């Protein structure tokens, strides 16, 4: 298998220490959501090894598949899950309760088919999705959810600023964040 298709992590994904302990080798596995039942032997397969950092105890996979392989054509759609659609409305209501600015702009990174942006749009908020899956962008567009296709990076941020025609800060309601932080320390 080509090394451009995946890389083996040498450091912990959380603490960056080089103390990875191999736990379970699950052999070569097809990508989730990419199973081709007609020709299973043609499915791309990648090593799947579970390891644990001896330092911070985080259990993680040892191999990282190239994101383009994983996400440029993505098959699962958020809208297929009744629970996700229901939760998107609850999530929207909760986030709106934290907002302290007029005319907020909602940006969802990894927006999939736009399901989580729909409730915000229905409330009259400006929304934009960013997702690398080229096959999901048309689905979002049909739902009148604007989307930029690509991996979230500086280039995408520049596109967003250009689309909005002004520099915009994405802020996290500082006042509420501080009170949540204080509350979590008290618990």
Predicted regions and their residues:
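Conserved class I S-adenosyl-L-methionine
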Residues: 103-112
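Conserved SAM-binding loop of SAM-dependent methyltransferases across substrates and taxa
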Residues: 113-124
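Conserved SAM-binding motif I beta-strand of class I
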Residues: 126-131
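Conserved SAM-binding strand-loop segment of SAM-dependent methyltransferases
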Residues: 144-159
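A conserved beta-strand element that flanks and buttresses the S-adenosyl-L-methionine
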Residues: 169-172
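A short, conserved alpha-helix within the catalytic core of class I
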Residues: 179-187
């Amino acid at each position: 298998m080509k090394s451009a298709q995946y890389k083996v992590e040498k450091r912990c994904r959380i603490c960056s220490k080089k103390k990875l302990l191999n736990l379970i080798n699950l052999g070569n596995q097809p990508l989730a959501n990419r199973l081709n039942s007609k020709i299973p032997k043609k499915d791309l397969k990648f090593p799947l090894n579970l390891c644990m950092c001896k330092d911070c105890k985080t259990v993680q996979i040892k191999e990282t598949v190239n994101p383009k392989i994983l996400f440029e054509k993505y098959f699962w759609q958020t809208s297929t899950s009744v629970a996700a659609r229901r939760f998107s409305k609850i999530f929207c209501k909760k986030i709106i309760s934290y907002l302290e600015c007029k005319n907020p702009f909602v940006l969802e990174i990894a927006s999939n088919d736009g399901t989580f942006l729909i409730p915000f749009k229905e409330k009259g908020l400006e929304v934009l999705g960013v997702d690398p899956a080229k096959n999901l962008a048309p689905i979002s567009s049909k739902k009148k959810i604007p989307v930029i296709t690509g991996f979230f990076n500086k280039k995408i941020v520049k596109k967003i600023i250009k689309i909005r025609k002004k520099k915009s800060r994405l802020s996290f309601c500082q006042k509420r964040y501080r009170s949540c932080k204080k509350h979590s320390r008290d618990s």
